């Protein structure tokens, strides 16, 4: 028999017994509630059940609101709305704000986007004003007048036939009538003033009509008041009603007459004033009508002088750039004669006109005629052809006639120059006038001096080239050109850019105007022919000399232009002047100049390296800061600096050997940072970046100390250390070995058969060993040993043996 409660029908349900066992799990006690709330069940995250009693929906009224029971946070809550999409933590918010501060907080107002929102309704205060006036009780007569004034001028004004007052309310009739009267009086004056301002109603009509309208309105108001009072009192009679009807009929007839008069006074002008249009649109007469080609009758000079009143007469009339020959008639009027069609035909076939023969008194050439005068001249010629009924097609005549002879050569030259300026090469345009000139920030480069030579140099201040923002250094022009081209300066704008940054430093070439004071100008053509003949003779002589030249070009004694050779290495390097025949002073001077040049070149290279090193330190570039090797203390220092630097999110270490990269990765883990190995081969390096754990936990300095006590030096694998660096850090091993051999060697030289130690001195009496032997009974010349058993008194002699012939 299975045990009771041993089988479970639903393993996911609460504990407290199986489905077929005890009934302890059926009831929800406090203990069971705690178990379900601990999160052990798989339904963790679902909303917890509540004990709120929900009434039946049928028992509620229609206007009762039932709130939703949900423990989830609404998506539209303030907490969710404060979060940006994709960033749920404060560190991510801070990083996002820091990265986009240039585009948000520091962005100038003129560069921020502007949003235009279209209004839902049209704002028209005048339309609202007219609506309010219409509701306030304006008579229909004036309302129609206002509508006609606001309508377009093409529509004719329509005046209603019957003016009837609109009563505002029935409760307060007396007050309403008084308000209507006051309003009508003010509206009449305003409307009449508007009409007079527009020029549509005369002053006389305004005065008469306004008085009539006011009287009629007052009479109507009085009659209405009387009728209303009679209605309230209940005193009405048949005779009075008939009389009132008769009065109303008379008033209507009078109102119709007033309306007819207003219609006659109100006129819309659709045609306009002809005189004003004539002044604004003058009709230009034809040029041919203004020019008369008929000659006046001849008159005597005395009559002309008498008519002129003694005034000076100039026969040449200058109009702009045109000079005309004039004549005066007997009436004192000046006339001129223009060329006929035949004369123009002769000009088109024979060429330009000889002005000196035709008009000797003219000061200017006919070629100075302007374009406007030339156009008028063509109109005149066309008029002459129409009047003369020439059997020549106008198109053919215009094509055959050379009208361009009137244009001056100077004007053509000016036009050519203007065209040349309009089609100027973009490279010649001043820098800063094209859109592509703003791709590079010119303020990054500053030049204060220029030095020309074999390699042009510029005294430049540039942080990326010199490594300093305040220091000027001499930089080759080629290096500067490569830099600006890489930063965005277009190649076709390079010349304009160089002229712009060196403006004021290079003297512009002054254009010399030749005065030909030293040049002989011949008055006849014979001298010119003689000069041409002499040039031909010189050219022939040069050709004959080259043909008769027997010696080749290589045999000519031309000094060489190759560089001087050097000899020696290192500090002993100097010029090789042995093959040159120079005196001693000249040799020493050349050698000194060469050494000064080498020292300047060496110091310049060192300054560049120092500037590059300082720039790398400022930008936290470890490749520049550690060119050859890193110490374990340097690695720990860089990690500590990177941890407290809020402006950097990542740091790249130089390429190290595999053990060095593992050491860097191990230290990054101790600092709670993320490490990534990048690159392959000799270019493999470790990239370290910060993450969330970096700010939540402290570094494990005990583990970092253990690593720092291991391998101390880590060399870069992408750079080879030079000999100077090895000697400065590790010492010169070759010299150290040579020094050790020199210390062990002796200056004495041995020969074949020499006795070893023959010249050695005797052991002194102060020697400790000799003192002990003397106390034991030893004396000088005796052998060592006890009595009866003493050794030899003479020591064994050792001789030097160098040869290999055997013993002798």
Swiss-Prot record:
Comp. bias intervals (Acidic residues): 168-178, 207-226, 239-273, 411-423
Family matches, as SMART domains: G_patch
Location of the G-patch domain: 765-808
Keywords: Cytoplasm, mRNA processing, mRNA splicing, Nucleus
Residue ranges occupied by any R3H domain in the UniProt entry: 629-692
Domain of life: Eukaryota
Bias (Polar residues): 43-52, 284-304
Any one of the GO CC terms: nucleus
UniProt feature, compositional bias: Basic and acidic residues: 195-206, 717-735
Residue span of region Disordered: 1-55, 143-311, 393-428, 593-612, 709-763, 783-808
A GO molecular-function descriptor: nucleic acid binding
Cell compartments where the protein resides: Cytoplasm; Nucleus
Basic residues composition bias: residue spans: 1-13, 799-808
GO biological process: mRNA processing; RNA splicing
Biological role stated in the UniProt entry: May be involved in splicing.
Family to which this protein belongs: Belongs to the SQS1 family.
PANTHER family: G PATCH DOMAIN CONTAINING PROTEIN 2
Name assigned to this protein: Protein SQS1
Organism (species): Debaryomyces hansenii (strain ATCC 36239 / CBS 767 / BCRC 21394 / JCM 1990 / NBRC 0083 / IGC 2968) (Yeast)
Gene for this chain: SQS1
